[in-house]
């Protein structure tokens, strides 16, 4: 029966997405693959991806892909040319495979055309028939900082046998603090890009960011986890980008003014991006970019488009072409990254693009986020007019078609944590000591002399932590580690010292520097784009679109919140806010990034004290506290460490700030119930290169709850 079903499968067409096609002249046996991925699945097609290169003798290489419903590839195998791996895409290959059966599991792998080298095997599932009564089982998270490689938690995701995973941004970090991974060249300056800084060329951006994506797929320990390779192969994925894919400076604001010419989008490389890198974020005149074509947008600049292209090279993303919106210059001619996909009769998944069109992230004179009245400007946008109209119509159409659950992926939170334009005054928060101390290594031996400098040479710096105290012969009092250098063999200290080779240094733990999220930053909807946020939520409320769940990451904590809006549009007046009916947000993650690592005390009592301090401060400020305590249809609340979770439904039952985590969402047959389960591990230290530990730090269900649909 299985064979008969597979025989009916045929590849109707295969679209090559590998840049230029080259004649292959390389010795295929020397080619190596670093990972496979599949993504953007529909009912009938999917994107498959790999990278293949002969590192010793790089040259274009033709690559085949094999598809089968047999995981052993012993039966029913279809083989065809996927494309050519070459330098224009940093040797990545993508192919769009069509003609698949709906709601079916497939396996795939890549080979050189002579069959001498084969990649690992990947797995994906196509979306079920949009009218079928199908259960849906998916997960999401984001934020993978090289400081936390090899991303131990990510290795556990494939065991969940997901229909798909939503990788919600910050799929790499451009920063320099990760051992063995130097920083990228600068992409500009914040808040004023006119300040002279070394500015990357096109080739530098392409090479630097390609390297960062590659490193997300390579092991950091001998015979260790291949970072995100097992994760990508384990299920099909959807992907969004956020600030770190765009360099975390002015390019993160695709809809902001380019600041002069858009840079070299034409001409001969290397291009110099001294222009087209933005404007002064402190100047309120730049808060809204005119949408009449008079001012060029950052999303048209050479730097932005280079970073966007590298992101697409390294993700299994369907290339949907350029948007035709002549009445919307902000959007017209940009790559379409946003889309919606129906998963059976009861679920629609919507993936938005929250970076390409957004207005500038506003700054104060002191270079802090300006989240005050400037954020209430009704002309400011995060999504752009074309995407916002599309999103609203997509939600309306889905609701009118009877789709029960509407999941909207956004890369930045849309809930409200702190008072408008300000921060919470926490009530009885944990002390620094209660968060715990950092750094378990107590001594280390120098392997080189330090002659009145601030650089100490040792065998390895893996596992050392900034802030640890250092003492020993030649070390001044009150010396601490100030930086872990990327060479993996040196660290910096805060004092000059003369230390001989072979000296044993004593190390003391570092105090925690954890700072809770107590406000809505300028990157968030509430902190920087309040009017458009309000318009979207008002549209949902006014049209009685129920069972809407926003999915977000980027705050490096897991929390669940109801959403409030101002029916009369008074976005700067807290008293005007009311709840959006049957609508909430899940903020998830990180899968492996900083923030949670600054908490080493993982006790339930510590997390409860922190959650209570935030919730009490929110109540004092007339804000809705963390959690879903009064949400209609809420039942079966579970929380690790809290046997009374379903009875009390406290803020801590919907909150995890100290873990690496992802959330699994299940919609059962009939679409009546949504189940949300947070899975995670205790956070680990930066640059510790910690592998998954099933004995001492096993994945656990942190919390879970069920929501009954309405009506």
PLM regions: where:
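Serine/threonine-biased, Pro/acidic-interspersed low-complexity stretches characteristic
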Residues: 5, 28-29
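Long, structured stretches of catalytic cores involved in phosphate-ester chemistry, encompassing
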Residues: 30-440, 467, 508-711
């Amino acid at each position: 029966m299985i064979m008969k079903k597979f025989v009916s499968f045929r590849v109707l067409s295969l679209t090559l997405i590998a840049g230029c096609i080259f004649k292959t002249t390389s010795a295929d046996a020397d080619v190596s693959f670093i990972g496979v991925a599949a993504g953007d699945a529909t009912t009938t097609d999917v994107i498959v991806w790999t990278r293949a290169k002969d590192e010793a003798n790089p040259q274009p290489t033709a690559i085949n892909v094999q598809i089968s419903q047999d995981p052993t590839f012993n039966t029913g195998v279809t083989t065809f040319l996927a494309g050519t791996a070459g330098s224009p895409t940093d040797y990545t290959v993508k192919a769009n495979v069509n003609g698949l059966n709906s709601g079916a599991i497939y396996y795939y792998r890549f080979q050189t055309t002579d069959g001498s080298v084969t990649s690992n095997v990947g797995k994906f599932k196509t979306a079920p028939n949009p009218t079928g009564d199908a259960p849906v089982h998916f997960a999401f998270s984001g934020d993978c900082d090289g400081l936390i490689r090899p991303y131990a938690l990510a290795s556990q995701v494939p065991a969940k046998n997901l229909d798909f995973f939503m990788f919600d941004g910050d799929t790499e970090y451009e920063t320099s603090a990760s051992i063995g991974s130097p920083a990228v060249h600068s992409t500009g300056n914040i808040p004023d890009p006119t300040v002279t800084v070394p500015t990357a060329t096109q080739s530098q951006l392409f090479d630097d960011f390609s390297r960062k994506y590659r490193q997300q797929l390579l092991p950091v320990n001998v015979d260790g986890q291949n970072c995100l390779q097992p994760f990508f192969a384990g299920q099909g994925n959807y992907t969004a980008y956020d600030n770190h894919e765009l360099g975390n400076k002015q390019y993160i604001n695709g809809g902001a003014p380019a600041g002069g010419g858009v840079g070299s989008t034409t001409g001969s490389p290397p291009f110099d991006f001294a222009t087209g890198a933005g404007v002064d974020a402190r100047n309120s005149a730049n808060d809204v970019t005119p949408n009449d074509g008079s001012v060029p947008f950052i999303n048209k600049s050479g730097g932005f488009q280079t970073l966007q292209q590298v992101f697409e090279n390294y993700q299994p993303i369907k290339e949907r072409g350029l948007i035709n919106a002549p009445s919307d210059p902000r959007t017209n001619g940009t790559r379409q990254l946003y889309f919606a996909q129906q998963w059976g009769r009861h679920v629609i998944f919507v993936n938005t693009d929250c970076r390409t069109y957004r207005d500038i992230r506003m700054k104060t004179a002191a270079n802090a986020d300006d989240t005050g009245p400037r954020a209430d400007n009704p002309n400011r946008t995060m999504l752009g007019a074309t995407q916002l109209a599309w999103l609203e119509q997509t939600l309306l159409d889905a609701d009118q078609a009877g789709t029960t659950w509407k999941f909207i992926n956004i890369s930045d939170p849309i809930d409200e944590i702190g008072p408008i334009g300000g921060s919470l005054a926490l009530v009885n928060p944990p002390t620094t000591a209660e968060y715990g101390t950092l750094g378990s290594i107590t001594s280390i031996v120098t392997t080189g002399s330090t002659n009145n400098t601030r650089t100490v040479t040792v065998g390895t710096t893996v596992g050392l932590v900034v802030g640890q105290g250092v003492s020993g012969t030649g070390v001044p009092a009150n010396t601490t580690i100030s930086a872990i250098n990327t060479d993996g063999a040196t660290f910096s200290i805060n004092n000059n010292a003369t230390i001989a080779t072979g000296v044993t240094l004593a190390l003391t733990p570092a105090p925690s520097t954890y700072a809770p999220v107590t406000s809505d930053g300028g990157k968030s909807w509430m902190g920087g784009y309040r009017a458009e946020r309000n318009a979207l939520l008002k549209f949902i409320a006014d049209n009685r679109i129920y069972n809407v769940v926003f999915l977000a990451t980027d705050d490096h904590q897991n929390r669940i919140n109801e959403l409030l809006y101002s029916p009369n549009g008074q976005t700067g007046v807290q008293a005007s806010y009311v709840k959006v009916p049957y609508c909430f947000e899940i903020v998830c993650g990180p899968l492996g990034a900083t923030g949670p690592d600054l908490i080493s005390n993982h006790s339930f009592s510590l997390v409860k004290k922190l959650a209570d301090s935030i919730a009490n401060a929110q109540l004092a400020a007339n804000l809705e506290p963390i959690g879903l305590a009064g949400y209609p249809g809420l039942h079966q609340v579970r929380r690790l460490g809290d046997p009374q979770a379903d009875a009390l439904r406290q803020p801590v039952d919907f909150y995890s700030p100290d873990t690496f985590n992802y959330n699994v969402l299940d919609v059962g047959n009939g679409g009546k119930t949504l189940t949300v389960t947070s899975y995670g591990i205790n956070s680990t230290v930066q640059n510790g290169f910690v592998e998954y530990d099933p004995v001492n730090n096993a994945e656990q269900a942190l919390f879970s709850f069920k929501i009954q649909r309405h009506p």
